[in-house]
From Swiss-Prot:
Main location: virion
Protein name according to UniProt: Polymerase basic protein 2
Species the sequence originates in: Influenza A virus (strain A/Chicken/Hong Kong/715.5/2001 H5N1 genotype E)
A single cellular component GO annotation: host cell nucleus
Function per UniProt: Plays an essential role in transcription initiation and cap-stealing mechanism, in which cellular capped pre-mRNAs are used to generate primers for viral transcription. Binds the cap of the target pre-RNA which is subsequently cleaved after 10-13 nucleotides by PA. Plays a role in the initiation of the viral genome replication and modulates the activity of the ribonucleoprotein (RNP) complex. In addition, participates in the inhibition of type I interferon induction through interaction with the host mitochondrial antiviral signaling protein MAVS.
GO biological process, one term: cap snatching
Matching InterPro entries: Flu_PB2_2nd, Flu_PB2_6th, Flu_PB2_C, Flu_PB2_CAP-bd, Flu_PB2_middle, Flu_PB2_N, PB2_helical, PDB2_C
Sorted UniProt keywords: Cap snatching, Eukaryotic host gene expression shutoff by virus, Eukaryotic host transcription shutoff by virus, Host gene expression shutoff by virus, Host mitochondrion, Host nucleus, Host-virus interaction, Inhibition of host innate immune response by virus, Inhibition of host MAVS by virus, Inhibition of host RLR pathway by virus, Inhibition of host RNA polymerase II by virus, mRNA capping, mRNA processing, Viral immunoevasion, Viral transcription, Virion
Length: 742
């Protein structure tokens, strides 16, 4: 109080006021503090002080020609004195108002294109629905989220090249536009921004927003896709949340979502094939998501999900060093361990060989609906702090942590035999056996774990074996917390290796991921996923297998035709016929195959024309291992549309219908393509029939001279073509086989 009184007295003297307002500041340290560097030290004060002046703005000299000296109210708009530090004019804020009202206008056509992301955001908010506000404790955990809806997924370098090419095409400097997306975007943007008058720098900034994914590590409870993150400040506070439904979707969220679905489908399918790794790569390379190659998306998209990471590992890309177990992402935050093989006995006296982690370690566990901190020693859980959305989610996290701890009481809690298998009918490894067992029923596990009295700690409560909360007792070492555990924030990626069974290991040999970790959740993709690989035909059901098999034969007819006559065994073993076998009744597969192969052999041996259409129709049936029998069939059954449908050996049926006039094939009413004529070989196809040692190429071709009789054919050299008279006066073009075949 004394000091304030003293100041009041000082201020009442006019000399004090004069010193404070009139004298110059000449202390070097102060001058340095406020004048060094370009960064404004006190922006708010500077703004107030500038705006109090009459002419706080400077403008280019040309402005005098374009703006009157006074406005309609007679207020001066610019000063006749030049700005001291430059050759610019001093201008009043009123000049800006005048310019905005009366200045020259320019075409607005480019604004929505350049500021596309803003215009789209306004639309999303306009059509979004805001629901009621709920007050409750928010369990937020920091996750790495995409904060920029509506972007492509280019790397910073790729985007930089595109921006330079679009905005500053005449600047020097090497720019390499290689990826498909780079080229498409560049072409599209150049067309959109022709004659654009918006400042190039602004255009460049806005393009960057459109091309590059920007992520931040933010506390989130609820939706993490970018259309939710853009309204984070409106939807969740410390103790409240507001319901919100976005008024539109953006492609980048759709890509992320569809990528996860495609990757899961591919990993699941690869697991059951003979060589999972080769199959997985074949499928990744032949799949498109929303019209873009999946491998291109994998290279650019930072989504971390088990199946996506397995695909990335297979492609030799780096992935996060965290590992996955029971659907939770584990990240070791301290400690270390060595792994030793140990044999343990379950409660059912079954012997399990497990890899025991010896040593003290701490982990964070992050799942979709629950998070936890786990401290463990060798085969012992020391402490588990869990938080989650609901009882169910918390229980899931506790089970995973208990199994991961490898404690003896967990192994002894097993009742019954462990014989869980994966999709390929292979036994799961022991840790996943235990996990599946307790995920089905954890009652015994929780009952046998043991409970302990607990201290009263802020923000923590206990949880009982029946998963009810308690302030007195809790499962041994387990506590439930109100606070979530943050996701691992680092974006560091490590080099990994993958074996043919799709197990992903880091360079120390620790397993980070395996197909067992891939979620079984089925979703509907937002973007069209096109699987070109025959391995994925069955994903859309039996009809799709049928149509795709015949489409494949027709598309590849030229090569199929030659193999059919020269190397049928190789043809029958093609993987494209694998999915078809699941449609043929098990009991009939071998008989059908034997029947069709015999029929085909007769066609190769016996004189006379034969119908391409029939070969195409019956070919898929010949792929199964044949049974030798004298059985004859007039129709073959396939299981589609929930029942057996017949394909007639001779003639059309609803399943397989060939229209001679249009040369088009329909399978189950869907168009399966046309039998095209081969320009080199007349009508290779429709009349293709076979003489022993000769391939019939099609109708007569006058270029090869008059028709020979069958006896004269023996004079032809291998590979030579000739017209020949067969059957009922038909003349066809044949070629002597290059090699003999039965």
């Amino acid at each position: 109080m004394e000091r304030i009184k003293e100041l009041r007295d000082l201020m009442s003297q006019s000399r004090t006021r004069e010193i404070l307002t009139k004298t110059t500041v000449d202390h070097m340290a102060i001058i340095k503090k406020y004048t060094s560097g370009r960064q404004e030290k006190n922006p708010a004060l500077r703004m107030k002080w500038m705006m109090a002046m009459k002419y706080p703005i400077t403008a280019d000299k040309r402005i005098i020609e374009m703006i009157p000296e006074r406005n309609e109210q007679g207020q001066t708009l610019w000063s006749k004195t030049n700005d001291a530090g430059s050759d610019r004019v001093m201008v009043s804020p009123l000049a800006v108002t005048w310019w905005n009202r009366n200045g020259p206008t320019t075409s607005a056509v480019h604004y929505p294109k350049v500021y596309k992301t803003y215009f789209e955001k306004v639309e999303r908010l306009k059509h979004g629905t805001f629901g009621p506000v709920h007050f409750r404790n928010q369990v937020k955990i920091r996750r790495r989220v995409d904060i920029n809806p509506g972007h492509a997924d280019l790397s910073a370098k790729e985007a930089q090249d595109v921006i330079m090419e679009v905005v500053f095409p005449n600047e020097v400097g090497a720019r390499i536009l290689t990826s498909e997306s780079q080229l498409t975007i560049t072409k599209e943007k150049k067309e959109e921004l022709q004659d654009c008058k918006i400042a190039p720098l602004m255009v460049a900034y806005m393009l960057e927003r459109e091309l590059v994914r920007k992520t931040r590590f933010l506390p989130v409870a609820g939706g993490t896709s970018s259309v939710y993150i853009e309204v984070l400040h409106l939807t969740q506070g410390t103790c409240w949340e507001q319901m919100y439904t976005p008024g539109g979707e953006v492609r980048n969220d759709d890509v992320d979502q569809s990528l996860i679905i495609a990757a899961r489908n591919i990993v699941r399918r690869a697991t059951v094939s003979a060589d999972p790794l080769a199959s997985l790569l074949e499928m990744c390379h032949s799949t498109q998501i929303g019209g873009i190659r999946m491998v291109d998306i994998l290279r650019q998209n930072p989504t971390e999900e088990q199946a996506v990471d397995i695909c990335k590992a297979a492609m030799g890309l780096r992935i996060s060093s965290s590992f996955s177990f029971g659907g939770f992402t584990f990240k070791r935050t301290s400690g270390s361990s060595v792994k030793k093989e140990e044999e343990v006995l379950t409660g059912n006296l079954q012997t399990l060989k497990i890899r025991v982690h010896e040593g003290y370690e701490e982990f964070t566990m992050v799942g979709r609906r629950a998070t936890a901190i786990l401290r463990k020693a060798t085969r012992r859980l020391i402490q588990l702090i869990v938080s989650g959305r609901d009882e169910q989610s918390i229980a899931e996290a506790i089970i995973v942590a208990m199994v991961f701890s490898q404690e003896d009481c967990m192994i002894k809690a097993v009742r019954g035999d462990l014989n869980f298998v994966n999709r390929a009918n292979q036994r799961l490894n022991p840790m996943h056996q235990l996990l599946r067992h307790f995920q089905k029923d954890a009652k015994v596990l929780f009952q046998n774990w043991g409970i302990e009295p607990i201290d009263n700690v802020m923000g923590m409560i206990g949880i009982l074996p029946d998963m009810t909360p308690s302030t007195e007792m809790s499962l041994r070492g387990v506590r439930v917390s109100k606070m979530g555990v943050d996701e691992y924030s680092s974006t560091e990626r490590v080099v990994v290796s993958i074996d043919r069974f799709l197990r992903v290991r880091d360079q120390r040999g620790n397993v980070l991921l395996s197909p067992e970790e891939v979620s079984e959740t089925q979703g509907t993709e937002k973007l069209t996923i096109t699987y070109s690989s025959s391995m994925m035909w069955e994903i859309n059901g039996p009809e799709s297998v049928l149509v795709n098999t015949y489409q494949w034969i027709i598309r590849n007819w030229e090569t199929v035709k030659i193999q059919w006559s020269q190397d049928p065994t190789m043809l029958y073993n093609k993987m494209e016929f694998e999915p078809f076998q699941s449609l043929v009744p098990k009991a009939a597969r071998g008989q059908y195959s034997g029947f069709v192969r015999t029929l085909f052999q007769q066609m190769r041996d016996v004189l006379g024309t034969f119908d391409t259409v029939q070969i195409i129709k019956l070919l898929p049936f010949a792929a199964a291992p044949p049974e030798q029998s004298r059985m004859q069939f007039s129709s073959l059954t396939v299981n589609v549309r929930g029942s057996g449908m017949r394909i007639l050996v001779r003639g059309n049926s609803p399943v397989f219908n060939y229209n001679k006039a249009t040369k088009r094939l329909t399978v189950l009413g869907k168009d399966a393509g046309a039998l095209t004529e081969d320009p080199d070989e007349g009508t290779a196809g429709v009349e293709s029939a076979v003489l022993r040692g000769f391939l019939i190429l099609g109708k007569e071709d006058k270029r090869y001279g008059p028709a020979l009789s069958i006896n004269e054919l023996s004079n032809l050299a291998k590979g030579e073509k000739a017209n020949v008279l067969i059957g009922q006066g038909d003349v066809v073009l044949v070629m002597k086989r290059k090699r003999d075949s039965s």
